[in-house]
Amino acid sequence: MPDLESIVKDIAAEMRARPDRGAVASYIPELARVDAQGFGLVVIDGEGRVAAGGDADTPFSIQSISKVFTLTLALGMVGDRLWRRVGREPSGSPFNSIVQLEREHGIPRNPFINAGAIAVTDLILSGHQPREALGEILRFMQFVAQDDSITIDERVAASEKRTGFRNAALANYMRSFDVIENPVDYTLGVYFHHCAIAMTCRQLATAGLFLAYSGHHPLAGHSVISAERARRINAIMLTCGHYDGSGDFAYRVGLPGKSGVGGGILAVAPGKASICVWSPGLDAAGNSHLGRIALEMLVKRTGWSIFGV
């Protein structure tokens, strides 16, 4: 095992000093207020050992990283029937694109673009009131993070609802094909709220441990999902986890991962560790600019890329 503590602290110090930080998300007003100078990095292994650097305990809006956990939850509820409503292919398009959805008759290309995550949220909502569905998602996040203090930032959720016209268009378009079955306002309400969950790098890295250890959560002491399902979720994270920057992330970092426009990236080194990095400045594809650079440095120094040293 490499000296993770030194590696993480070195990377955090280098990232804090860099001037090229990207631009914070401006289309969600609450996210536009975030200080672009923040940077945190946490690596947690199966023994519970933690290497942390920078703003490891600063909460941030997890945004699309929540889609990993809603996918996990929905698969637990409906199994492979989920794939009748959502595909498993990279989109190659921006995360909120409606063009592809129109071409493919309302079936989203994968569960990590906005349309796909809205369809997955609709599956979780079925048979529940919105408050119940949201409570189930939040309790699952608290369980895998082993922290009951995790909450939803209501200001971010309200900000997303006020400005989420493109997401409303996606949801209504899918409703016209019966891909969405519940009232659109209900589905979007749950979606906006789970994207507005606030977590720290330490909490998110803990939450991802079950994906790093074949579905078994070493800190919780039992399996969350089967090894096969963990492997398949990791595969989708690798191919689809960074919108139209997914191929570049696989090329540069070589780990399954999921980004969010709040500046976080959850990455998985199978059998080795769960990693979360946060830096709110984004690149052109909506992924954390310094977060990707930091992960590239981490895999070079640890040899953790799934494609080899």
UniProtKB/Swiss-Prot annotation:
Protein EC: 3.5.1.2
Subunit structure: Homotetramer.
HAMAP family registered for this protein in UniProt: Glutaminase
Gene3D superfamilies: DD-peptidase/beta-lactamase superfamily (3.40.710.10)
Keywords, sorted A to Z: Hydrolase
Catalytic activity: L-glutamine + H2O = L-glutamate + NH4(+)
Gene Ontology biological process terms from the UniProt entry: glutamate biosynthetic process; glutamine catabolic process
Top EC class, one word: hydrolase
Annotated binding of substrate, by residue: S64, N114, E160, N167, Y191, Y243, V261
Highest taxon in the source lineage: Bacteria
Pfam families the UniProt entry points to: Glutaminase (PF04960)
Organism of this sequence: Methylorubrum extorquens (strain CM4 / NCIMB 13688) (Methylobacterium extorquens)
Entry GO MF terms: glutaminase activity
PANTHER family: GLUTAMINASE
Similarity comment text for this entry: Belongs to the glutaminase family.
Name by which UniProt lists this protein: Glutaminase
